[in-house]
Amino acid sequence: RFAEILLIYAEATFELQGKKLTQTQVDYSINRLRDRVNMHRMNLDELSAWGMDLETELRRERRIELAGEGTRYADVMRWREGELRFGRAITGPSLKVCMNDLGANPYPDTGVDEFGDVIYEKSTAEGGARYFDATKHYLWPVPNPERQKNPLLGQNPGWEK
């Protein structure tokens, strides 16, 4: 999709120019995405004045624009941020239906109270710790059928067993 092409352009240009973009390049890429939804335009002078890192902002822009489209894992691998992003427990909101003292949901039909407020119990539960091994997980294993076709073909580090 066109939005992803603009994001790729911004990221590639940023990398090729030594971690720099001009305002014209930001306008051509990121701000075209923001303009279509009437969002505040990215301004390099504002980012600098606010002490914000352009690389972080470009990556955040990509994460938001492509949310739910299955690109996050490949992005994190390309940026070599696996340890940071995948080496910790998954956290996030967890909503549970509110129950009264009798163990029944007092608002079973709508989930809202008489004032129209959504009722839920806050949960601080976390998922289990995730495991990420930088010596292994940045590469995929070479498939066994390919190794059987060519016995001289080795295996990527960490996947030998």
Where does each model-flagged region fall?
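Acidic/polar-rich alpha-helix caps and helix-coil junctions
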Residues: R1-K161
